[in-house]
């Protein structure tokens, strides 16, 4: 019963998580709009090229949202080998000349309160738990409620990790051969945080 009841809430929670990730991306872009605009202008791509580049970045927006979620969850993400962003800070390296990446924080250590980003997946977990408990009878046992909440957290974390795995890739070889979130750690961190939020 727990699995069947958890599917609907997990789908909704996955959508909420993706939306939260996209909001984080938009906030980062707003804070770094000057640098993003500078890189965009430096490309000198012309009208058609600018449209194509914008379309490419919009298409990749769900990926960026997942990377932002991975940052909030703890594992962080990398754009290139040596260029990573985690709670501890941003590490610079050779970066692809893509405007949206200019919205990343400048290399350096982050303040300790950056770890408060974990409140985002915890809140998503709380939402997932609320939806999960609402999918079963009000008089169900506490055990049944906890079970469906945990299964919902598991399905949500698995769905997000699968989307990250499918959307991951490379922009070339060597330093650009791996980008995005570390899927395994992303899944484990999300599972723990969503589960905690779901049952609290």
Q: Regions from the language model: what does each represent?
A:
Residues 35, 43-117, 165-200:
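Long, glycine/tryptophan/cysteine-rich extracytoplasmic
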Residues 80-81, 112, 126-128, 160:
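Extended hydrophobic-aromatic, low-complexity segments
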Residues 141-158, 163-181:
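Long mid-to-C-terminal scaffolding/interaction modules that assemble large complexes
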Residues 20-31, 66, 70-73, 156-168:
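C-terminal TM-helix exit segments that contain a strictly Trp-centered aromatic cap at the helix terminus
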Residues 1-42, 47-51:
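N-terminal membrane-targeting/anchoring modules of bacterial envelope and secretion proteins
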Residues 1-9, 29-30, 123-150, 196-200:
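Cytoplasmic membrane-interface segments at the C-terminal ends of transmembrane helices
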Residues 6-22, 118-123, 149, 153-157, ...:
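Alpha-helical transmembrane spans of integral membrane proteins, capturing the lipid-embedded, hydrophobic core
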Residues 27, 31-35, 132-140, 167-175:
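Membrane-interfacial segments
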């Amino acid at each position: 019963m727990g699995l069947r009841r958890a599917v609907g809430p997990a789908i909704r929670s996955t959508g909420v998580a993706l939306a939260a990730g996209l909001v984080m991306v938009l906030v980062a872009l707003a804070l770094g709009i000057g640098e993003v605009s500078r890189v965009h202008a430096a490309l000198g791509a012309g009208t058609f090229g600018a449209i194509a580049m914008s379309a490419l970045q919009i298409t990749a927006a769900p990926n960026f949202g997942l990377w932002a979620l991975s940052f909030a969850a703890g594992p962080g993400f990398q754009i290139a080998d040596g260029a990573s962003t985690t709670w501890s800070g941003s590490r610079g390296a050779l970066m692809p000349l893509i405007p949206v990446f200019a919205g990343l924080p400048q290399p350096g250590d982050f303040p300790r309160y950056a770890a408060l980003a974990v409140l985002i997946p915890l809140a998503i977990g709380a939402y997932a738990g609320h939806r999960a408990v609402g999918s079963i009878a009000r008089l169900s046992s506490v055990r049944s409620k906890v079970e469906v909440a945990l299964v919902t957290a598991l399905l949500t974390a698995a769905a997000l990790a699968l989307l990250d795995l499918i959307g991951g890739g490379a922009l070339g070889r060597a330093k650009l051969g791996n980008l995005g979130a570390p899927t395994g750690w992303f899944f484990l961190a999300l599972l723990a945080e969503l589960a905690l939020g779901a049952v609290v």
